From Swiss-Prot:
PANTHER family: HISTIDINE BIOSYNTHESIS TRIFUNCTIONAL PROTEIN, HISTIDINOL DEHYDROGENASE HDH. The gene is hisD. The active site is at E327, H328. Binds 1 zinc ion per subunit. The keyword Repressor does not apply. Zn(2+) binds at Q259, H262, D361, H420. Catalyzes the sequential NAD-dependent oxidations of L-histidinol to L-histidinaldehyde and then to L-histidine. Its cofactor is Zn(2+). It comes from Zymomonas mobilis subsp. mobilis (strain ATCC 31821 / ZM4 / CP4). Its EC number is 1.1.1.23. Belongs to the histidinol dehydrogenase family. This is Histidinol dehydrogenase. GO terms for cellular component: cytosol. The lineage of its organism: Bacteria, Pseudomonadati, Pseudomonadota, Alphaproteobacteria, Sphingomonadales. GO terms for molecular function: histidinol dehydrogenase activity; NAD binding; zinc ion binding. It holds the Pfam family Histidinol_dh.
Amino acid sequence: MLLKLDSRKADFQADFTRLVDERRESEGDVSRDVSAIIADVKKRGDVAIAELTQKFDRHDLNKGGWQLTQEEIKKACDSLPSELMDALKLAATRIRYCHENQLPESSEMTDAAGVRMGVRWQAVEAAGLYVPGGRAAYCSSVLMNAVPAKVAGVKRLVMVTPTPDGFVNPAVIAAAVISEVDEIWKIGGAQAVAALALGTEKIKPVDVVVGPGNAWVAEAKRQLYGQVGIDMVAGPSEIVVVADKDNDPEWLAADLLSQAEHDPTSQSILISDSEDLIEKTIEAVGRRLEKLETQKVARESWDKHGATILVQSLDEAPALVDRLAPEHLELAVADPDALFANVHHSGSVFLGRYTPEAIGDYVGGPNHVLPTGRRARFSSGLSVIDFMKRTTYLNCSQEALSKIGPAAVTLAKAEGLPAHAESVISRLNK
């Protein structure tokens, strides 16, 4: 049943705390299964990959091919409607522009002691992108993960995607081409993540693995982190909409359902100072659910995890939002920037009535790969930084060392590390 809260009620804080603490991520214990798959790939390599692909995807890699061929890629792109191809290209252009403006600059300075120091940013050499497979076209996820990697300067970008019965969605292939993906492998699941992280006879390992997936994919990324970098371990999608009385309930209902239709464990929350707007929005959600193709999933999400919060003033909203730290936040109010100034924890924020979250999913520009499960309190969405690393460097002249070296000797001796001290002393005494 939809949760309806009212900040004027005596039990509001307790009820809101339960909402914040609600656990929606899968509690199924897939850890043991994933550990076994990783161990199998580590031991048997391509043989394990082929067997698991046959088992889960009913695709014989040795007969149907491990990688997409140029002929298969061309055929897929040619089959796409021009309208869809144009939309993919527009989205890629906008994502590229946004992420080019995120590139960090290397820097160097010389301090008063004459020590030259700096930081140099470089892209990782290889990155792996996981794309969910089947007939669902997650083409936007390809763009959102692959374009930043190439903007960062990644030379080898590898995509893996499950191919149930040998099928790969043409829109996914086209998005990979537009994003300049270098290799497309017909494998999926935890075994694909293991192949990217560990490498096999056919597949060279990568340095970073990104991309969405099911519980097994997320668990594989978690277990392999440290051997390979990852973007994040994401959970169910979520949205908080803060709205004043001057909104169209139909618009708000559509926005709330845009996240509810993702997964039964997704969460959609409406915060408003207008009880009338809340009630009309709830009614609009009900009407829209009757016509929605994804109504089964969306209804379960809305009924089990949806919530409305009536506040006395929208000034209360930022504090509530910060406790929820949502993946997506819409500020559908007259002055969204004023409210935004007081919000500190959200994966991405959509300002004003004409900026639905769905625009950010596809063509807005900023990345749609965002922290969930309140992780926006300490982490950020995917960016070029996830495909880069920084190296610091120092350069001391003899004169510079003579100025700062004695302090290093003192600290080394205080820590009981004589070899450290001698490393500096030997140069000071020369």
